[in-house]
């Protein structure tokens, strides 16, 4: 079944700057098949190939969502952080947008105990318990709560490893990529001209720096996920 999100406009892609790669001095030869040309020292990605691969990723995501699969969206660079959280919440996905903690997936049991601690502290805060404690003790717990929220808020309701991980910047999130490979978790990854497409299951050649590009692609992927959830099998 085709999804509404697969109506991909090349004009919209151009307007969002999806096709702009990095400077020609900064590239990975493995991205050569996805590069159309270079202009003023900048690589230009082959927009038709990007559109095709994005369409495939959207269809894959919709089908996975229809089967109840769980998604994790990862993007911790400053220009992507708020876009990641907004898109994830809209599509009911888990997300990491501040810092990838080493072992977030490969050492999930330890991370899960921290998530449990976050929930405990939030329950205590909501019940007014923290305000009834001695000032020093309350201050320590409140600092702990702030820290846990900062890094774990997006996976607070994740009770198991995700089935699919969407990654915004392959190089920035190298540890996340490595953990997914080690655990055999499929990845959908934006790959700019300096990335290695072989490290991801479903590469989407695209500008991974511009907010407009990140927003546009996230919107397509999360729209597909939402549509898939509406036709759960």
Curated annotation (Swiss-Prot):
Keywords: Chloroplast, Plastid, Ribonucleoprotein, Ribosomal protein. Disulfide bonds: none annotated. GO terms for cellular component: chloroplast; mitochondrial small ribosomal subunit. GO terms for molecular function: structural constituent of ribosome. One of its GO terms (biological process) is translation. The keyword Chloroplast applies. SUPFAM superfamilies: Ribosomal protein S2. It is found in: Plastid, Chloroplast. It comes from the Eukaryota. The keyword Cell membrane does not apply. Belongs to the universal ribosomal protein uS2 family. This is Small ribosomal subunit protein uS2c.
